[in-house]
């Protein structure tokens, strides 16, 4: 049954002819046998398809799309690959498989959660997909795609995840393309902001004993610092400590 997936990949990359009707019937007749293949093997074959040199041409072949979506129903949003500009194409083809799959599986439903459940992927990649999913949902509710919120992502996560978020929305949000490309360029050489306040500083300056209250106070200071464009005065720190 792996031959079905390998045929799809071969046809996508090399064939210049149409699928024969007889072969279509054979594949459709045997498609249920795919369930006998392990999820690890299926994921490996899917990676090969996604990293194929002609991957972005996939939607031009209705039969390929039909069979791939029967095998991988989570790929219901393959139409996202239609009408991409050169910037969007470059982002997709230059990124790794898990970024590519995130672009396809994330929507308003639990589709991406089901993909994570079905396939055995690392916790790092699970968290990566979940971050993109959560940010996508938040952005649907209200426009949170601002420079300040991107700074927060950089501070709370890392540069790689920030790039994921920006790249994801460049591909998915054609209406804001110029703004998103500017954000990408702006953050290219930026480092995460640093809060120059720690537990030792608070205990020594305000004569506070070590304990849970120090941690709670630090969290309040950090929140104020983040909400205020990553700035906080000595007066505000004192106010929070003594509140």
Each model region followed by its residue ranges:
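Short acidic alpha-helix initiation/capping motifs at coil-to-helix transition points
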Residues: 1-4, 21-22, 37-41, 50-53, ...
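Short, amphipathic alpha-helical segments that act as regulatory/interfacial helices
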Residues: 5-12, 47, 63, 218-222
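A residue-level signal for conserved active-site and pocket-lining positions in enzyme catalytic cores
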Residues: 4-7, 61-62, 133, 202
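Solvent-exposed, amphipathic alpha-helical segments
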Residues: 26, 42-45, 49, 220, ...
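Charged substrate- and nucleic-acid-binding regions of tRNA-handling and nucleotidyl-transfer enzymes
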Residues: 11, 170-243
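Short, surface-exposed acidic
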Residues: 18-22, 69-73, 123-129, 208-217
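Internal alpha/beta core interface subdomains
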Residues: 1-34
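Conserved, hydrophobic alpha-helical core segments of structured domains
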Residues: 31-174
């Amino acid at each position: 049954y792996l031959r079905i997936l390998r045929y799809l990949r071969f046809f996508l990359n090399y064939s210049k002819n149409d699928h024969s009707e007889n072969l279509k019937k054979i594949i459709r007749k045997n498609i249920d046998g795919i369930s006998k293949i392990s999820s690890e093997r299926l994921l490996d074959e899917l990676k090969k398809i996604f990293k194929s040199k002609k991957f972005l041409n996939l939607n031009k072949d209705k039969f390929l799309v039909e069979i791939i979506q029967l095998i991988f129903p989570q790929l219901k949003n393959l139409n996202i690959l239609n009408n991409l500009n050169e910037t969007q194409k470059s982002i997709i083809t230059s990124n790794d498989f898990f970024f590519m799959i995130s672009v396809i599986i994330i929507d308003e439903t639990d589709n991406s959660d089901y993909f994570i459940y079905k396939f055995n992927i690392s916790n790092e990649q699970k968290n990566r997909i979940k971050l993109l999913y959560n940010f996508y949902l938040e952005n649907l509710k209200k426009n949170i795609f601002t420079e300040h919120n991107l700074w927060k992502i950089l501070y709370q996560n890392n540069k790689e995840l920030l790039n994921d978020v920006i790249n994801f929305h460049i591909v998915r949000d054609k209406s804001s393309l110029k703004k998103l490309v500017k954000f990408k360029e702006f953050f290219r050489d930026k480092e995460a902001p640093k809060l120059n306040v720690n537990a030792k500083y608070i205990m020594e300056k305000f004569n506070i004993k070590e304990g849970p209250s120090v941690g709670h106070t630090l969290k309040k200071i950090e929140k104020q610092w983040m909400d205020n464009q990553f700035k906080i005065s000595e007066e505000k720190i004192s106010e929070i400590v003594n509140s």
